[in-house]
Amino acid sequence: MKDEIISYRQMCDAEKVQTLQRGMNYRLNANYSVILMSQRHNAPYKDRVLSDGMTIEYEGHDIPKTSSDIDPKQHNQPQTTISGKLTQNGLFASAVEDYKLGKRKPEIVRAYEKIFSGVWSEKGFFNLIDYKYITINKRKVFRFFLEETEIDFNAAGIIENKLRQRTRIIPSEIKKIVWERDEGCCVICGATDELHFDHDLPYSKGGASITPDNVRILCARHNLQKSDKIE
């Protein structure tokens, strides 16, 4: 669920895997791909949310560090392996190219973000719509662009719900402030499980997610009660 606060173990369980070791996971299951992102100061890649509040710019991944004398940041991010097989970068880029040629719909990607050590938040589902392969600091890097979408699960898998209103992404720095301010628990009952970052005032009613004053932590029960009152 979007903006749900979860542990690493809960994230893996949600995706029905033992571990998630890669940041990019093309078609982790039959329905969608998965990315792990971070905007922390020590993050290895430059991921960010664009100013529209609904688009993620996600950096591709470096070559593996196979020995101590290899610095991945001095090498181009690869599209293929030495044997010619597509890397995760290549798989994501190929999906974009096929989408642009009208061969397929955009790849659906589920995004999770690391907030603190051991604390993750689901950012929701996105359409993978574009990429660039650009030169930065004398090497080539991938930049993937993902646009937020609303998804419903059904017996056949997943379906895009274009009738549901999209909501802007709560910035990571706001989540960090709110987590510390609310001490990692529901502000109403003090629960410490099934937590969500909640827009205190919905966007449709004039709320914004750019300040901590409009975001709080709620448990699933109180988040549902609030939704019922709004509707």
Question: Residue spans of the language-model regions?
Answer:
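Acidic, glycine-rich low-complexity segments with interspersed aromatic residues
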Residues: 2-121
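Short beta-strand element of the conserved SAM-dependent methyltransferase core
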Residues: 36-37, 144-148, 217-219
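Short, charged surface segments at domain edges that flank catalytic/cofactor-binding sites
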Residues: 96, 150-185, 209, 213
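Eukaryote-biased feature marking scaffold/signaling PDZ-domain proteins and nuclear chromatin regulators
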Residues: 104-106, 123, 141, 192
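A structural signal for short, well-ordered beta-strand segments and their strand-loop junctions
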Residues: 111, 187-188
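Compact mixed alphabeta submodule
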Residues: 114-162
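Histidine-centered nuclease catalytic patch
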Residues: 189-217, 230
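Long, charge-rich boundary regions
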Residues: 220-231
